[in-house]
A protein has these predicted regions:
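Nucleic-acid endo/exonuclease domains
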Residues: 1-110, 116-121
Length: 121
């Protein structure tokens, strides 16, 4: 796990904290199922990932597909945002996240969906 958020992650985190007043609570860099998630809202089973240039390689893209499939089987939805989208239009990113949350009912947490010790990948 990184000690500090990247600038785009920090910018998104500030925006996500604004969603708390509407009852949406995100955790940052959460260790779950052997992975560190950039942000996760467990109640709504929503994962947010901030992707930089390293995610454009085929190897990393395959890793991301596998990871997303692992969480999809657990009932989680993953939204990925490019650094540039957060930098250039944070408002649109937050609006999209809010729209997804508002149209997704909260899901019950089961034992299998609770966090487990993470690992860096």
């Amino acid at each position: 796990m990184r000690k500090a958020l990247t600038p785009p992650e920090a910018r998104l985190w500030v925006g996500l904290k604004g969603l708390r007043r509407d009852g949406y609570h995100f955790r940052k860099q959460a260790p779950v199922r052997g992975y560190f998630l950039d942000f996760v809202c467990f109640e709504y089973r929503l994962i947010l990932e901030v992707d930089g240039a390293s995610h454009r390689t085929e190897q990393q893209a395959e890793h991301d597909r596998i990871r997303d499939a692992v969480f999809a089987r657990e009932g989680f939805r993953t939204l990925r945002f490019e650094n540039a989208a957060i930098r250039d239009n944070l408002h649109a990113v937050l609006t999209y996240i809010r729209d997804v949350l508002e149209t997704s009912p909260p899901g019950p947490l089961t034992r299998s969906s609770l966090p487990m010790k993470g690992r860096e990948s």
